[in-house]
Regions:
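Conserved hydrophobic/amphipathic alpha-helical signal-anchor segments
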Residues: 10, 35-84
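N-terminal single-pass transmembrane signal-anchor helix
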Residues: 12-39
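Domain-level signal for compact, non-enzymatic binding modules
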Residues: 16-17, 56, 109
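Conserved coupling/switch loop of ABC ATPases
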Residues: 17-26, 47, 74, 93
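Amphipathic alpha-helical protein-protein interaction surfaces
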Residues: 27, 51, 87-88
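Low-complexity, acidic interaction segments enriched in glycine
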Residues: 60-140
């Protein structure tokens, strides 16, 4: 039998079938989706860690304010007292916002730190008092 006229050899020489191409595209799509989900989860975790770290750093600035002013700023004064204290130099140039663009919340005495104060972020949902709030208290 002549190799040029063999239908099996001609089919193999033409390349992949439509079904094979669809399977490869589907597999690429599944891998891309899995990687995308993993990246988004890491992004959210990074934002939560950033918010927690910022809350702790703001808390350290509040402690410094206490040393300079013989007491914590009132809840009414809020965190703006760190940038505009009643006496002395500002402790912070400006108070940062959380990773989601919201202001940090300052409460004295705190709900979590009852003998001190709470500095907290509303978290990714932007709702105060929900489960995703993070602040200057130990993780539960």
């Amino acid at each position: 039998m002549n190799k040029k006229n063999n239908p099996m050899i001609k089919a193999a020489a033409r390349g992949m079938s439509l079904l094979e191409i669809m399977v490869v595209i589907t597999l690429i799509g599944l891998v891309t989706a899995a990687v995308g989900v993993a990246v988004m989860n890491q992004l959210e975790k990074g934002q939560m860690d950033t918010a927690r770290n910022q809350a702790y750093e703001i808390g350290k600035s509040v402690e410094l304010y206490k040393l300079q002013n013989a007491g914590y700023p009132s809840t009414a004064q809020g965190l703006n007292a760190l940038a505009n204290p009643p006496k002395g130099k500002p402790i912070m140039e400006r108070v940062p916002q959380d990773p989601w663009g919201n202001d940090y919340i300052y409460v004295v005495p705190g709900a979590k730190n009852t003998n001190k104060f709470d500095v907290r972020s509303k978290g990714p949902d932007g709702v105060e008092g929900s489960e995703d709030d993070v602040g200057n208290w130990p993780e539960e």
